[in-house]
């Protein structure tokens, strides 16, 4: 059985922030976020987005082991700007398990309904300058620091839950010449 626990303590927040490092520990393509930045994101005193956002985050637990995490953000500013009524999901990570995925997204969807939102959209951050998006191809390439890495199975779980892709974002790698003669010319 999966239990969903709302993050209310600093210890739980540390678990929430550290979870991707555990889930992807054997994945060389994963680039971890900066621990202090992620901790600050959820600190109302340090993140100015809390002036116009409401946010909550949860841990998924099974038999005392963490098996997933998800955050939810209600950005009043973004909804006003884009004329939407959306709840954002963010920082979602989970094992390949239908019950875990269901429990995490059901929790966000429930809060979205309580707040009167029409839809859940993501993964997005507090602002449009935060990490966003979900990897749908290129799992064999090192992820970028500004985007999320996720396992390929996420797509199947989100599709099964009724989520659809909103937009394609393309990330490119530019090789910078290291030949001294070329560099001197510039």
Language-model regions, residue ranges each:
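Extracellular structured ligand-interaction cores
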Residues: 55, 86, 119, 169-171
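Acyl-donor binding region in acyl/amide transferases
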Residues: 79-164
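A short helix-loop-beta-strand connector motif used in the catalytic cores of GNAT acetyltransferases and
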Residues: 43-59
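Acyltransferase donor/substrate-recognition loop-hinge adjacent to the catalytic core
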Residues: 148-186
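Short amphipathic alpha-helix that is part of the acyltransferase structural core
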Residues: 1-45, 169
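Short low-complexity, flexible loop/linker segments enriched in glycine and/or proline
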Residues: 41, 135-138, 181-183
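Conserved beta-hairpin
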Residues: 55-70, 159-161, 165-168
